Design a protein with these regions (language model features):
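Exposed beta-sheet edge and beta->alpha loop/turn motif
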Residues: 90-141
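Short solvent-exposed beta->alpha transition segments
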Residues: 33-35, 49-102
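Short, low-complexity N-terminal intrinsically disordered segments enriched in polar/charged residues
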Residues: 3-4, 12, 20-47
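Second-shell loop/turn segments in exported
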Residues: 25-26, 37-40, 55-60, 110-112
Length: 141
């Protein structure tokens, strides 16, 4: 009887731990997706300076504002305006190749651009030291 009670107690503790961890990751993922959508709205509106200013320190240390403006306009201009964007997935992680340890969410959107339908945008917000999600990477495939 004691063994059964102990096993049930351990399973319940384990299940509560998984649920809490999953719920915390879901909250972080949701906040990061919101931040990514807001940032993408700036890029969609060609507010490149503002998007650079709102990006993560890691991003800004790698790309100057002038380089960002040139890079993003050269990538976005040929694909045209966004016609639709649908969230495909978001994955929380604490490590990324080439990035500092921290909290990241790798987000993918299926995006239909006017001149490049069926594209995949990958955007990676990271949490800064003040708890704000800021974009640290952006790619279109």
């Amino acid at each position: 009887m004691k063994t059964t009670t102990l096993i049930k107690s351990l399973l319940l503790t384990y299940a509560v731990g998984i649920f809490t961890t999953t719920a915390q990751a879901d909250e972080k993922t949701e906040a990061a997706v919101t931040a990514a959508k807001e940032w993408l709205a700036q890029v969609d509106a060609k507010e490149y300076k503002k998007s650079w200013q709102e990006a993560a320190r890691f991003f800004k240390d790698k790309v100057t504002e002038a380089n960002w403006n040139e890079m993003v306009s050269s990538v976005r201009k040929p694909v045209g305006e966004v016609k639709s964007r649908e969230l495909v997935g978001a994955q929380f992680t604490t490590t990324l190749p080439g990035g500092p340890e921290g909290e990241y969410v790798v987000i993918q959107f299926k995006t239909n651009f006017a001149d490049k339908p069926d594209s995949v945008e990958t955007i990676t917000p990271m949490k800064d030291d003040k708890g704000t999600w800021r974009v640290s990477g952006y790619f279109i495939k």
